[in-house]
């Protein structure tokens, strides 16, 4: 009740009503059933997106992802959750702002990073996606516009490509990272200094510290590699992201209802 299907001709064109919500959830909790914690977190965030749902988990050495079109209760059953083992999890419910409602656009998105694997869940919109895609093309020769046309067509795919490329090479060709830092308002940050002085290949942590100041727009991100959970939001906090403390870990979510 209250849900309507997208029309068959749904595309990236502007629509008559805003479509700007998604729900993200992440948890790092050794000894806990993180896939079920994430399931219930996403269930509490279901109002933020009804097109697809997904969960990625890591046991410290391998990331598994399960996602599909539909509601949280339709996508996951006991068997699916039992197969998602580990102590770190990232989850997502989607309400499209860009890209068609296809399996390829369901999140979390899984991709490579230097020496590791990345699972990424994203809420929001980037306003400089074209510039970022051009910088990726100038650095690696990879034409993201063609790749996105064949499959995923979201900002999330661009973010995943950026994190992978910067982790491997350390920087983007022709990109003024110093200007990004000044614009971001980040100053006197020893961790950021370490990220920019580290030689490539970079950890996901250091790659993220270089990539995040490049982003323009409103966004919140929850992502992980095999051993660490990360979370970030735009400097103005336009897209919500809250932090919660567990007895032996941490959780992040789009809303406190999920905590």
Label each PLM-derived region with a short phrase.
Residues 1-259:
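Conserved short alpha-helical segments that host acidic/polar catalytic motifs at enzyme active sites
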